[in-house]
Amino acid sequence: MTKKIEEKIEGVIESLGYLLYDVSLVKENEQHVLRVSLKNPNGAVSLDICQQVSEVISPLLDVCDFIQDAYILEVSSMGLERTLKTPKHFKLSLGEKVEVKLINKESFQAVLKDANDLSADFELEDHAIKSVGYKDLKKVKTLFEW
């Protein structure tokens, strides 16, 4: 269902100048919550941006009626530290520092240099490039350095 929602709202969000990072539908305290997270290619995602996107996509979602039950719409920034789960997440996080854990228990920190639909390339501290298929990744998380 979230894939249908994503397909419906992605173009609208892009027409406003922002990028759709993720859509998730969760149940919290007996209430359905539809979370839409954004990336602003020109800087931070402000509260005004979240409100603007919410006001545009809310009526669209109501008309499409993808979610039968009542729900709360939450629009937010994708966040500074987040787990990368899909090729899209990797592509929208290029240039960021990440912590990588592989299925074989190897782990390292690197800069995410490139990503496609099958793998991601990481620049290690010695500037070597390590290419890893998504199937070999256990967890990849962005790191924010204070």
Curated annotation (Swiss-Prot):
Xref: Pfam families: DUF150_C, RimP_N
Biological processes per GO annotation: ribosomal small subunit assembly; translation
Single GO cellular component term: cytosol
Keyword Cytoplasm carried by entry: yes
Keywords from the named record: Cytoplasm, Ribosome biogenesis
Cited SUPFAM superfamilies: YhbC-like, N-terminal domain
Listed CDD domains: YlxS_C (cd01734)
Subcellular localization(s) per the UniProt record: Cytoplasm
Lineage: superkingdom: Bacteria
PANTHER family for the chain: RIBOSOME MATURATION FACTOR RIMP
Functional note: Required for maturation of 30S ribosomal subunits.
Family membership noted in the UniProt record: Belongs to the RimP family.
HAMAP family: RimP
Name of the protein in question: Ribosome maturation factor RimP
Organism (species): Helicobacter pylori (strain HPAG1)
